């Protein structure tokens, strides 16, 4: 949960489950000198629930073997896309952005063998955790996306470290629970780009996508998205330019049917939220 909500979450959990054995992480528990002891308590204890902040959760390492496997999968994904483009456009065709991404991943893979564990902690896989619930899960939407689409807004190849860490831990839990064991709670699963829908599905139903033959973003985009090009004002405001954006859904009913296999969608109307009336009764153009 977000750091300010740890105490409230613990109180609510005990109110609902008064006989539960819970462990609540404090700021001191994750100080460098005490972190190893606290993580050992998780591994050796018999807890119904362990509550900690997003930043504390990230400090529990995932195994180097799992990181290596993910990097190899990403390198293979980019290599396949590059080969496909060269086959279509000729051997001299180069994709600088994707070649650069591949090189960075290979460097990460090379340095991984020399990377020591954070504080020599027990890894996440060794804790005995069998499920996870992430509050405000939209904080982990910034995953790196590898695509052969060039110069298209709405597709980011850079990702946040905490999102990659969450992805690896979710993959592990999905493997040991046959695709279950992960709960994301958020009011904004999609807020900035269409790619966020793909990211949510990657976290929660990766196996379902693969059963449909969707193993990477470009395959998902070909089924459920469309790139549109429009004339836009330049940043300087001195002229116009054509800009391509990945911003239009296709096959939306089919996509929502798939997503609803893992999503319990609640709209404002369904929740009957008490929203105050607008002053003046209508929006004001500023």
Model-derived regions: residue spans:
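Inter-lobe coupling linker of SF2 helicases/translocases
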Residues: 35-82, 93-96, 100-131, 139-141, ...
């Amino acid at each position: 949960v977000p750091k300010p909500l740890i105490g409230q979450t613990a109180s609510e959990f005990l109110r609902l489950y008064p006989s539960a054995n819970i462990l609540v992480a404090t700021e001191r528990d994750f100080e460098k000198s005490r972190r190893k002891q606290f993580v050992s308590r998780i591994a050796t204890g018999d807890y119904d629930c362990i509550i900690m902040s997003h930043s504390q959760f990230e400090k529990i390492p995932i195994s180097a073997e799992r990181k290596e496997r993910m990097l190899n999968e990403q390198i293979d994904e980019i290599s396949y896309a590059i080969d496909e483009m060269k086959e279509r456009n000729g051997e001299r065709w180069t994709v600088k952005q994707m070649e650069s991404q591949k090189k960075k991943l290979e460097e990460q893979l090379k340095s991984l063998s020399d990377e020591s564990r954070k504080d020599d902690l027990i890894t996440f896989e060794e804790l005995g955790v069998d499920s996870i619930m992430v509050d405000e899960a939209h904080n982990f939407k910034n995953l790196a996306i590898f695509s052969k689409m060039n110069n298209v807004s709405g597709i980011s190849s850079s990702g946040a470290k905490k999102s990659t860490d969450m992805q690896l831990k979710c993959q592990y839990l999905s493997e040991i629970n046959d695709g279950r064991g992960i709960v994301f709670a958020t009011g904004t699963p999609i807020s900035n780009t269409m790619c966020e829908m793909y990211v949510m599905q990657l976290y929660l139903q990766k196996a379902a996508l693969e059963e449909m033959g969707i193993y990477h973003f470009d395959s998902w985009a070909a089924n459920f998205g469309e790139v549109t090009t429009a004339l836009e004002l330049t940043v300087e405001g001195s002229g116009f330019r054509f800009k391509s954006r990945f911003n239009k859904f296709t096959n939306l009913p089919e996509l929502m049917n798939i997503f609803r296999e893992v999503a319990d969608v609640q709209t404002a109307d369904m929740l009957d939220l008490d929203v105050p009336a607008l002053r003046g009764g209508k929006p004001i153009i500023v």
